[in-house]
Amino acid sequence: LTAPFVLCKKVIPIMEEQGAGTIVNVASMASTAAGRGGLAYTSAKHGLLGLTRQMSLDHGRTGVRINAVLPGPIATEMIARVLAIPQHPVTMKMGMSPAKRPGEPIEVAQAIAFLASDDASFIHGAALAVDGGYTIF
């Protein structure tokens, strides 16, 4: 949480001077719910979402847009190990989610690119879930 805070505080004045800028924070599906054994991680991600929304409110009128993506399970080595366990809660829940698969890193990158683009010019302080519907239920 410290790094995004410090980076935002450094870059926002430059963006305001330019009259425009976009920040996309990478949070997590843990930003909106509690998880097993993740006190520090979940607390930090909740904090990052709060930081995103508050900074968006504080700086949006100066032309700076600040949003966040909330990735769910993404196809990484860690998730592959988890999904190899049929009875793991993540494996079971993913099987019930609309996408029924982990996301690909490129799918998160595309969401970030969208939020950073002019096509998202009316989006401020948003938390875009990129999770294949994992957090619907």
Functional labels for PLM-detected ranges:
Residues A33, I112-A113, H124-F137:
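Short C-terminal tail/terminal secondary-structure segment
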Residues S28:
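Residue(s) in the substrate-gating loop at a strand-loop-helix junction
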Residues C8, A44, T52:
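Active-site helix of classical SDR
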Residues S97-V108, D119:
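A conserved structural motif in NAD(P)-dependent oxidoreductases
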